[in-house]
């Protein structure tokens, strides 16, 4: 069963020239988001640009959130990743989805109209309530931090 999420089309090219976000395969975890820009755009090395996706969503269910993740091929082949590394969309957000695109390579990257540039994934959310304590119950790890458990 799929959870219904409200989607608003902000760019009329979505649904006509370019498809609505959808799962590519039965096993896909994310839906591709597209660059709904007006003209071809070049992102210079080291530059970050905010790219519209042409849609807005309203998750509504506080037990869910959406995350924006980079597409692996863009990062590996072209050095294009998300400027904020991961985008978190809270269940009560209703504004346009924008993708912060960072060119971490040393060559310019050309983004064409409608290019797929990020993935939208829905994840469960647990809202925690803190319980104040003076001490923690002991654990095997304790305060061991970065690199504490080794590499092998």
UniProtKB/Swiss-Prot annotation:
EC numbers: 3.6.1.23
Keywords: Hydrolase, Magnesium, Metal-binding, Nucleotide metabolism
Alphabetized SUPFAM superfamilies for the sequence: dUTPase-like
Binding site for substrate: 71-73, 84, 88-90, 98
GO molecular-function term, one example from the UniProt record: magnesium ion binding
Class of enzymatic activity (EC top level): hydrolase
CDD domains, alphabetized: trimeric_dUTPase
UniProt pathway: Pyrimidine metabolism; dUMP biosynthesis; dUMP from dCTP (dUTP route): step 2/2
InterPro entries: dUTPase, dUTPase-like, dUTPase-like_sf, dUTPase_trimeric
Reactions catalysed, as given in the entry: dUTP + H2O = dUMP + diphosphate + H(+)
Highest taxon above the source species: Bacteria
Keyword Magnesium: yes
Cofactors: Mg(2+)
Gene Ontology biological process terms, A to Z: dUMP biosynthetic process; dUTP catabolic process
HAMAP family reported in the protein's UniProt record: dUTPase_bact (MF_00116)
Family statement: Belongs to the dUTPase family.
Function: This enzyme is involved in nucleotide metabolism: it produces dUMP, the immediate precursor of thymidine nucleotides and it decreases the intracellular concentration of dUTP so that uracil cannot be incorporated into DNA.
Full protein name: Deoxyuridine 5'-triphosphate nucleotidohydrolase
Organism expressing this protein natively: Shewanella sp. (strain MR-7)
Name of the gene this protein is made from: dut
């Amino acid at each position: 069963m799929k959870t219904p999420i409200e989607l608003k089309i902000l760019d009329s090219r979505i649904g006509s020239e370019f498809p609505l976000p959808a799962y590519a395969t039965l096993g896909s975890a994310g839906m591709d988001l597209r660059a709904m820009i007006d003209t071809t755009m070049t992102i210079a090395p080291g530059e970050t640009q905010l790219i519209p996706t042409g849609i807005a969503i309203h998750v509504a269910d506080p037990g869910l959130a959406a995350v924006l993740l980079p597409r692996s091929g863009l990062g590996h082949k072209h050095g294009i990743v998300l400027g904020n590394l991961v985008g978190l969309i809270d269940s009560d957000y209703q504004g346009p989805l924008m993708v912060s695109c960072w060119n971490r390579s040393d060559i310019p990257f050309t983004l064409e109209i409608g290019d797929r540039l990020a993935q939208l994934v829905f994840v469960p959310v647990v809202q925690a309530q803190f319980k104040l304590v003076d001490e923690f119950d002991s654990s095997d790890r304790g305060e061991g931090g970065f690199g504490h458990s080794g590499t092998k």
